[in-house]
Curated annotation (Swiss-Prot):
<dbReference type="GO" id="GO:0015979">
    <property type="term" value="P:photosynthesis"/>
</dbReference>
<keyword id="KW-0602">Photosynthesis</keyword>
<keyword id="KW-0472">Membrane</keyword>
<dbReference type="InterPro" id="IPR010010">
    <property type="entry name" value="PSI_PsaM"/>
</dbReference>
<keyword id="KW-0812">Transmembrane</keyword>
<keyword id="KW-0194">Cyanelle</keyword>
<dbReference type="Pfam" id="PF07465">
    <property type="entry name" value="PsaM"/>
</dbReference>
<dbReference type="InterPro" id="IPR037279">
    <property type="entry name" value="PSI_PsaM_sf"/>
</dbReference>
<keyword id="KW-0793">Thylakoid</keyword>
<keyword id="KW-1133">Transmembrane helix</keyword>
<protein>
    <recommendedName>
        <fullName>Photosystem I reaction center subunit XII</fullName>
    </recommendedName>
</protein>
<keyword id="KW-0603">Photosystem I</keyword>
<dbReference type="GO" id="GO:0009522">
    <property type="term" value="C:photosystem I"/>
</dbReference>
<comment type="similarity">
    <text>Belongs to the PsaM family.</text>
</comment>
<dbReference type="GO" id="GO:0033115">
    <property type="term" value="C:cyanelle thylakoid membrane"/>
</dbReference>
<feature type="transmembrane region" description="Helical">
    <location>
        <begin position="7"/>
        <end position="26"/>
    </location>
</feature>
<keyword id="KW-0934">Plastid</keyword>
Length: 31
């Protein structure tokens, strides 16, 4: 069983690149 800290870290590592990619896609879509 993973510790809560490990789960949170894994989620953060997975979400941050996704959010950055989404923001980049939205910025490119505007132009």
């Amino acid at each position: 069983m993973l510790a809560d800290g490990q789960i949170f870290t894994a989620l953060a590592v997975a979400l941050v690149p996704g959010i950055l990619a989404l923001r980049l896609a939205l910025e490119l879509y505007k132009f």
